[in-house]
Amino acid sequence: MEALTFMKFWLTNNTTIKPRREIRISESAVDSTTGSEDPDLDLCEGEDSFFELKISLSDFKTPKEKQRLETTTTTTTYSVSNKSKVLPFVDISSKPQQSPTTLLKSGQKFRAFSFKKSEKSTTTEKKKEENNRTSLNVRFRVDDETTTTSFRKTASIARSQQTDDTMFDDSVSKRFFSLIKPLYTKSTKKQSSSTITSPTSSPATREKQRSNIPSGMRSVRRQLGKSRSASAAIGGMSPANRIDESLQVQQDGIQSAILHCKKSFHGSRESSLLSRSTSESSSQEKLSTSSSEDSYLFSRISSDSISEKSMDSLTSIKEQREKISD
């Protein structure tokens, strides 16, 4: 009984909004008539005690079904038989037993978790998201326009710079040629006049001029005169003749290179021959010096031998004279 009352108290405290489950407990005693008729049943009353449970499971039903269940209460009877006899139950729903635990007050109830959001917050969040989307679209469009305009500006600037460079190059080249042309004409006129007046000039004056100019300057003047005459001749000739002359110049350069190689090869051979001849002459000189030394030594040796012989002969003559005198 105490356990069932505790369950009732626990269920009422746990359920806040839902209707609480009703647990009704009733005990009935056996009628005195049955006890008087059968003495064996009196002994079994304490052992075969029974109780009645009335439970309304409103938590697992819809609200309409809950209302129906509250209006119509079903009574379930449990019968316990002993010696094939049925004992009736007595309904004590009108007089529920009061337990000391029902007097206790339930503690304060707190809502620990709130998963639901208010409708106002959801509407405000939706409006914010829409505003953000519109602002992002506007920003992207502006960026695209700025990039296209900047690209066009850079392309136009590059084109203008290219045109300015080409115009600058053309203007500079024209100015350069306009400045060089009179100088070139003057130099050509001077060269032509000098070539015309040079044959009429007297040889004495030429010799004086040559005597006054050093030899190095003369060679430089000759080379410059040749190059100028060649350039002047090329300037007045047709392109076909120029090509022919360029080919001839290339051939002359090739032939001169071949001749130079031959000369260097022959020069190396001549140098080797000269080195050989010098080595042979040096060896001959060494041999001659050695032979002269040998002849000198031989003459010396011979003179020494002759002197020794003469000394021996003199000593022998002296000995003979001494013997004769004795």
Curated annotation (Swiss-Prot):
* Keyword Protease attributed: no
Where is region (Disordered) located?
188-239, 267-326
Q: Which InterPro entries match?
A: MAKR2/5
Please list the tissues where expression of this protein has been recorded: Expressed in roots.
Compartment(s) where it occurs, according to its Swiss-Prot or TrEMBL record: Cell membrane; Cytoplasm, Cytosol
Biased composition annotated in UniProt, kind: Low complexity = 190-202, 270-305
What does the record note as the disruption phenotype of the gene behind this chain? Partial suppression of phenotypes observed in brx mutants such as reduced root growth and smaller root meristem size. Reduced sensitivity to externally applied CLE45 peptides in term of root growth suppression.
GO BP annotations, alphabetical order: regulation of cell differentiation; regulation of root development
Q: What are the alphabetically sorted keywords of the record?
A: Cell membrane, Cytoplasm, Membrane
Q: What does this protein do?
A: Positive effector of CLE45 peptide signaling. Post-transcriptionally regulated amplifier of the CLE45 peptide signal that acts downstream of BAM3 in the regulation of the transition of root protophloem cells from proliferation to differentiation; thus preventing primary root elongation but stimulating lateral roots development.
Protein's UniProt name: Membrane-associated kinase regulator 5
Q: What is the lineage of its organism?
A: Eukaryota, Viridiplantae, Streptophyta, Embryophyta, Tracheophyta
The encoding gene is MAKR5
